[in-house]
Structure formats: structure tokens, C-alpha cells
Design a protein with these regions (language model features):
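Short beta->alpha junction loops
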Residues: 46-54
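Short, electropositive alpha-helical surface patch
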Residues: 55-71
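Extreme N-terminal starter segment of soluble prokaryotic enzymes
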Residues: 1-3
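Mid-chain, well-packed structural core segment of small domains
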Residues: 67-105
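Intrinsically disordered, low-complexity terminal tails and inter-domain linkers enriched
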Residues: 146-173
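Glycine- and acidic-residue-enriched helix-capping/strand-helix junction motifs
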Residues: 14-28
Length: 174
């Protein structure tokens, strides 16, 4: 099984940008955590980050031709603006989980709108880096035919993003 983890604009600045919201851990630490979890799950994973909307669209489209079984997508700011990402997800029809490190429901009102969510299996937010691992687990379960109710998005407090990699698992979004 192959999972593609796609991260949008400014996620390369993790640990620098607003650590009180997004935590003190770096993007490299996130990718390392994801890679280690992939080994535990016996799957392959690719982490990709771009600050450019068109590059993100191309990466989603390329996934269709690369035998990708699932996508973990943190579109970052493009969550709230990008019809192009929505259309790319519609085109490829690869199971996708939308992930956000922070509690997007507690940030500015405009950040509470997701253009991509309707094409995702579910959304996980507020679980810090652990949200990525939860998304990977969910996609593996779906691919292996393990039935789960994944229709309800996360709406409750779970963890403090400032301690994103060590916080206890909170409310499940699946």
C-alpha cells in the first residue's frame, strides 16, 4: 500500500511560524514521524510540501498514475480558497483524509470553511502531528477492508498543538 502525504503553504515553516498554534516541532520532524509510522504499518509513504497551488494540484493528479492508494492532505491556507484542489480530488477519486494540526474551528471564522472536505473520507483537526498518523491508520484500515464509520468530522478538543507529537490521543475524528 502507498500513501501520499501532501502539505500546503507555510507548513515548511513548522516550528518557526506561530509555535503557540502549530507547535515547536519542525516539518522535518513531522516527515520523520510519518516515515516511522509507515514502517510500523508496513506501507510506503511519500511526504510532499509546496507553497504553490498548481504544484499541489499536479501532485494530486500524478498520484492517480502512481498507484497511490490514499492521500493525507493538509491543504493549509488553500483549504479555504481552492476550488482547484477540490476539482483535482474529484478527478482522481483516491480516498483522502483532510488533516489540520491546529483547531481550525477555533481560529478565524474564514478558516472554518473547507473547500476540499466534501471530497474527503473525513477530516481530522486539532490532534497535532498525531492527526497525520490517525489519517494513515484510517486509510490503511479502509484499504484492508476494515469497516469504520468515518463520516463525522472532528469537532471536539483533543490535544494542545504546542505539544503535538507527545500529547495523548484525544477525541477520534473517525
Amino acid at each position: 500500500m502507498k500513501i501520499l502525504v501532501i502539505n500546503g503553504p507555510n507548513l515548511n515553516m513548522l516550528g518557526i511560524r506561530e509555535p503557540e498554534i502549530y507547535g515547536a516541532q519542525t516539518y522535518d520532524a513531522l516527515c520523520s514521524l510519518i516515515s516511522k509510522h509507515a514502517v510500523e504499518l508496513d506501507i510506503s509513504v511519500e511526504c510532499y510540501q509546496s507553497n504553490h497551488e498548481g504544484d499541489l494540484v499536479t501532485k494530486i493528479q500524478d498520484a492517480y498514475f502512481s498507484d497511490v492508494d490514499g492521500i493525507v492532505l493538509n491543504p493549509a491556507a488553500y483549504t479555504h480558497t481552492s476550488v482547484a484542489l477540490l476539482d483535482a480530488l474529484k478527478a482522481v477519486q483516491i480516498p483522502t483524509v483532510e488533516v489540520h494540526i491546529s483547531h481550525v474551528d477555533k481560529l478565524e471564522e474564514f478558516r472554518q470553511v473547507s473547500y476540499v472536505r466534501s471530497e474527503c473520507v473525513t477530516a481530522i483537526w486539532g490532534h497535532g502531528f498525531n492527526g497525520y498518523l490517525e489519517a494513515m491508520d484510517l486509510l490503511v484500515s479502509l484499504a484492508r477492508g476494515i469497516s469504520e464509520d468515518v463520516t463525522a468530522p472532528c469537532t471536539e478538543d483533543a490535544v494542545d498543538a504546542a505539544d503535538a507529537t507527545t500529547a495523548e490521543e484525544g477525541t477520534s475524528c473517525a
